[in-house]
Amino acid sequence: MIPGEIIAASGDIELNAGAPTVTLEVSNTGDRPVQVGSHYHFAETNAGLSFDRAAAHGKRLDIPSGTAVRFEPGQTRSVTLIPLSGRREVYGFRQLVMGKL
């Protein structure tokens, strides 16, 4: 072993195993691209994105940590969301929650 080396287990690693999911259609109605990161509270994303925000409340994208999804102007795509975990408190973003979910 080399100091700092990471030896991953063999096989596939399932992300967010067992987490309940919601799939939503999202459209970028704006004139600029919008990029949403993996742990952003999806209900508070850019107002130019059109989707069921109530269904997205308390949820984030079901994608690997540190990655993002980009919505080009006029583009519609499906995204899968999972519940935010941990203490389930949201602060910042667009300041629509600022506390417990």
UniProtKB/Swiss-Prot annotation:
It is an enzyme of class 3 (hydrolase). One of its GO terms (biological process) is urea catabolic process. It catalyses: urea + 2 H2O + H(+) = hydrogencarbonate + 2 NH4(+). It is found in: Cytoplasm. Pfam families: Urease_beta. The keyword Hydrolase applies. Keywords: Cytoplasm, Hydrolase. Its EC number is 3.5.1.5. Gene3D superfamilies: Urease, beta subunit (2.10.150.10). Pathway: Nitrogen metabolism; urea degradation; CO(2) and NH(3) from urea (urease route): step 1/1. Belongs to the urease beta subunit family. NCBIfam families: PRK13203.1, urease_beta. Heterotrimer of UreA (gamma), UreB (beta) and UreC (alpha) subunits. Three heterotrimers associate to form the active enzyme. PANTHER family: UREASE. This is Urease subunit beta.
